[in-house]
């Protein structure tokens, strides 16, 4: 890789030279210059490295490229180098396309923008350019770029866009650069590093990365991605270089950013690679580039005061870097000013966690940073974090900053995106994301960015809306769905790709990685293209910031994909979109394994969705289809996963929103994208999985259990309940049934239990009358039986029932007298029967507290009195009636009265004993017999 790097380095002279020219031109930002450079770039690209290529590419972006270059030359180098890599692929296209488009557009636009932005950044003239480039330019570039190739290219250039351009194809290179910058996954590491590197280091590293990337392009393969991811992951810093190298391979390059030492990074990277091409270019590229470029520039400028502080931080801490970078990027890009402080802080915050805190951060970040974050974010959750933070931080700023940044950053990107591309869109999404929104995201992201860009992010809403529509068209669908998913998953822009969402959902890192995968421009592309139209509304609808975030991811993924679609297609250069995606996915999938599988398979519902993305990507060779599928599917999946993640991380909202969006997107996409059979399949699979999962999971267990329990218990309860108290009976039976059912076949167990319960109750008419009589008392009865059942589910029931029935009959007989006929007797009788006569029942009552102790005691007393009277001990018929009458009015009254009479008739000790017995079941049972 280094060697490659060396080559680039060797070429460096030309590249740098070119850069210089480029820079010179950049400052001029002459379109012709850009064109020329583009030509030269092409020529240089002929040189493979033809750093000029980057320059060329960037030339249009030259400002951007310049920025990139400025970024440290790294940009150039990166740029150049990656470009070489990309260059061949992307550069020409990007160059031509980009240059023209961007050149004019970018130059003027970005230049101006850049200039103003850069102004602050001025410090880094290149920064300025770069930033401009990145920001104004790169984005525009990207925007203009709008072309896949261009995008790829633009990203590079624009992103300094290298990222963008690079992103797409250059992505690798650019990515490298950006990646280096951070754009990639390293985002954090890389970014940081890159940033640092970028600053000074970047050059080499960048170059390396570029080179690496370049070299790796082939490699880029997935391995790179993967390895990148891993490597990057591991050594973000190193990764920067190494990773970068690794990453270099096209995706790798991208990955690198993505690889970003972290998966997230990877994600980013991946995204960068896959998405990267798409997303990353935009997001990454844009954001990354912009951010990166910017960052780089920042990095470069790092030196910038603002950056400096930040940058230093950035440089200093890689995470810091990232953060800073991000922030810077954001800031810078944002307008540096905008976020800087905030970003910085945020970034910092983020960064720390950034890393991975990133998911959330990421999401935000991505959003915020989107452009950068995306890349960064994506790649780097950190960045994301940063971004996120920014977003968060931005929170407020968010709209402005974030959005602005996003816009701006994104905007640039977005524009680019818009124009440029899905990618941009994606990016924008990111930006948007920040702002967010699904709707926005994809949409606005695209649009907004493009437009709002766009402007600003200020116009966030507008941009969003605007962007939304366009973006929406483009990104939204996918973005929406995807973003939703992605967003959801992570919102993460990170996922920029889709995965992000998924991944995000899953893990930022993993997600990232995966996302990157999924994200991979492919899905995104597809989705983007596909979704674009469809989800537009969705995206629009989604336009929520939150959504944005979410969408962002999706959008990013999506958008990027869009861009990516093209880009990817071209970039596929590295690999065919389908292929690349697949590889990336596959590769990353391994890492993401869960995800991956799903990705490929889409089986895992959760994973599937995101994976779906991946899968769709993989499966559907046609990115678009896959994308659609993925998109559709991913969204769902991502939602699931993401939802979980999001819910947890992000919170339900994302999830919720996402799901809806996703669903919608999905529905939409699938329908609209039927073209992609894969998508449909994926969707179907996803749906099936999802539904099935839900159905199977919830229904099977629930239904079976419920049916079994409910059925057995219900039936049991049904028959007995009438006889006894519904509440008690139900509880008892249910308990019994449940206990029995679970263990024994529910049917068998349930049946027996029923039989027992039913038999006891059926045999004794008492139960039925009790139901007629006092519900409370009856409950006691039922409870007693039930308890019996519970105690001795099978045998005890039989035994208990016999005991109970006798008691009941006795009670009945006794109450059967005139007193029994009376209402009071009914109430009292039942309770008394259960309580006094049925020891178990009584115990149950007491312990179960089915009835209040006092009530039971009174009932018992009454019952005893009646019995006594009946027996004739002291019982004169006269006394009995009064109790009945009194009882009628109320148990309490009757009881009290009865006791008085009873006392007169009988020894007070008996009553006392009864009362005590109530409290002491055993005594009570003794008392009863004694009383009699």
UniProtKB/Swiss-Prot annotation:
GO terms for biological process: neuron projection development. GO terms for molecular function: phosphoprotein binding. It is found in: Cell membrane; Cell projection, Growth cone. Residues 257-281, 343-353, 408-423, 545-561, 583-593, 642-660 have a biased composition (Polar residues). Residues 31-43, 424-443, 479-491, 684-697 have a biased composition (Low complexity). Residues 1-149, 178-808, 866-908 are annotated as: Disordered. Expressed specifically in brain (at protein level). It is a lipid-anchor. Palmitoylation on Cys-923 and/or Cys-924 is required for membrane targeting. A lipid is attached at residues 923-924 (S-palmitoyl cysteine). Residues 821-932 are annotated as: Interaction with GNAO1. The modification Phosphoserine is found at residues 22, 33, 190, 369, 377, 393, 495, 519, 714, 817, 836, 917. May be involved in neurite outgrowth. Interacts with activated forms of GNAI1, GNAO1 and GNAZ. This is G protein-regulated inducer of neurite outgrowth 1. It comes from Mus musculus (Mouse).
């Amino acid at each position: 890789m280094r060697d490659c790097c060396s080559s680039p380095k060797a070429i460096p002279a030309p590249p740098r030279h070119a850069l210089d020219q480029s820079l010179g031109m950049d400052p001029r930002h002459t379109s012709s210059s850009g064109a020329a450079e583009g030509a030269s770039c092409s020529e240089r690209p002929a040189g493979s490295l033809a750093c000029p290529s980057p320059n060329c590419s960037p030339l249009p972006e030259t400002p951007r490229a310049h920025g990139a270059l400025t970024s440290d030359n790294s940009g150039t180098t990166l740029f150049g180098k990656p470009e070489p890599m990309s260059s061949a692929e992307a550069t020409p296209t990007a160059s031509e396309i980009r240059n023209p488009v961007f050149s004019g557009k970018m130059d003027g636009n970005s230049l101006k923008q850049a200039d103003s932005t850069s102004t602050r950044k001025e410090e880094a003239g290149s920064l300025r350019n770069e930033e401009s480039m990145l920001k104004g330019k790169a984005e525009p570039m990207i925007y203009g770029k709008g072309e896949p190739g261009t995008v790829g290219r633009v990203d590079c250039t624009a992103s300094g866009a290298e990222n963008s351009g690079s992103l797409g194809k250059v992505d690798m290179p650019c990515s490298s650069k950006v990646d280096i910058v951070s754009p990639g996954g390293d985002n954090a590491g890389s970014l940081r590093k890159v940033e640092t590197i970028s600053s000074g280091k970047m050059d080499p590293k960048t170059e390396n990365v570029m080179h690496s990337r370049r070299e790796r392009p082939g490699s880029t393969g997935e391995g790179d991605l993967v390895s990148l991811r891993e490597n990057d992951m591991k050594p973000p810093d190193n990764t920067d270089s190494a990773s970068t190298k690794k990453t270099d391979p096209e995706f790798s390059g991208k990955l690198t950013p993505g690889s970003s030492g972290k998966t997230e990074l990877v994600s980013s990277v991946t995204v960068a690679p896959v998405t990267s091409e798409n997303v990353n270019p935009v997001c990454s590229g844009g954001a990354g580039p912009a951010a990166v470029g910017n960052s780089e520039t920042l990095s470069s400028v790092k030196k910038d005061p603002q950056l400096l502080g930040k940058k230093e931080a950035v440089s200093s801490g890689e995470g810091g870097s990232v953060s800073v970078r991000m922030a810077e990027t954001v800031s810078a890009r944002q307008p540096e000013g905008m976020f800087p402080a905030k970003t910085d802080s945020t970034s910092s915050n983020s960064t720390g966690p950034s890393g991975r805190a990133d998911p959330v951060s990421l999401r935000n970040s991505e959003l915020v940073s989107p452009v950068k974050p995306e890349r960064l974010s994506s790649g780097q959750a950190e960045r994301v974090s940063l971004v996120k933070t920014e977003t968060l931080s931005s929170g407020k700023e968010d709209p402005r900053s974030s959005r602005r940044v996003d816009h701006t950053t994104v905007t640039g990107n977005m524009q680019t995106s818009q124009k440029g591309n899905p990618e941009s869109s994606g990016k924008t999404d990111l930006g948007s994301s920040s702002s967010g929104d699904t709707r926005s995201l994809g949409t606005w992201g695209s649009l907004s960015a493009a437009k709002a860009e766009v402007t600003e992010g200020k116009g966030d809403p507008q941009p969003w809306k605007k962007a939304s529509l366009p973006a929406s068209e483009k990104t939204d669908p996918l973005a929406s769905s995807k973003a939703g998913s992605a967003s959801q998953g992570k919102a993460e822009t990170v996922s920029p790709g889709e995965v992000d969402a998924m991944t995000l959902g899953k893990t930022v890192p993993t997600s990232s990685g995966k996302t990157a995968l999924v994200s991979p421009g492919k899905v995104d592309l597809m989705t983007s293209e596909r979704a674009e139209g469809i989800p537009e509304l969705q995206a629009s609808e989604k336009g929520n910031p939150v959504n944005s975030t979410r969408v962002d991811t999706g959008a990013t993924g999506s958008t990027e994909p869009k861009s990516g679609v093209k880009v990817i297609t071209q970039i596929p250069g590295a690999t065919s979109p389908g292929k690349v995606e697949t590889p990336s996915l596959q590769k990353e999938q391994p890492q993401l394994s869960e995800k991956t599988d799903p990705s490929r398979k889409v089986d895992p519902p959760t994973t599937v969705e995101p994976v779906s993305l991946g899968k769709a990507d993989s499966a559907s060779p046609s990115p678009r289809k896959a994308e659609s599928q993925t998109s559709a599917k991913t969204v769902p999946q991502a939602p699931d996963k993401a939802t979980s993640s999001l819910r947890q991380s992000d919170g339900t909202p994302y999830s919720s929103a996402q799901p809806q969006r996703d669903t919608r997107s999905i529905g939409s996409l699938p329908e609209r994208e039927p073209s992609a059979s894969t998508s449909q399949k994926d969707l179907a699979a996803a749906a099936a999985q999802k539904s099935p999962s839900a159905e199977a999971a919830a229904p099977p267990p629930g239904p079976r259990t419920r049916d079994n329990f409910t059925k057995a218990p219900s039936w049991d309860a049904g028959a007995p309940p009438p006889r006894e108290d519904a509440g008690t009976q139900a509880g008892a039976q249910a308990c019994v049934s449940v206990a029995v059912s679970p263990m024994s076949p529910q049917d068998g167990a349930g049946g027996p239990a029923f039989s027992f319960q039913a038999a006891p109750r059926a045999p004794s008419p008492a139960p039925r009358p009790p139901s007629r009589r006092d519900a409370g008392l009856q409950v006691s009865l039922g409870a007693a039986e039930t308890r019996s059942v519970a105690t001795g589910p099978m045998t005890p029931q039989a035994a208990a029932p016999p005991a109970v029935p006798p008691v009941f009959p006795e009670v009945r007989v006794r109450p059967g007298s005139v007193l029994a006929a009376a209402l009071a007797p009914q109430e009292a009788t039942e309770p008394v029967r259960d309580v006094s006569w049925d020891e178990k029942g009584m115990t149950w009552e007491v312990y179960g507290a089915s009835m209040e102790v006092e009530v039971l005691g009174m009932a018992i007393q009454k019952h005893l009195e009646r019995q006594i009277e009946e027996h004739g001990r002291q019982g004169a018929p006269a006394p009995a009636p009064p109790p009945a009458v009194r009882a009628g009015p109320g148990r309490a009254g009757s009881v009290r009265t009865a006791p008085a009479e009873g006392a007169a008739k009988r020894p007070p000790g008996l009553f006392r004993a009864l009362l005590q017995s109530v409290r002491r079941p055993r005594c009570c049972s003794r008392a009863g017999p004694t009383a009699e």
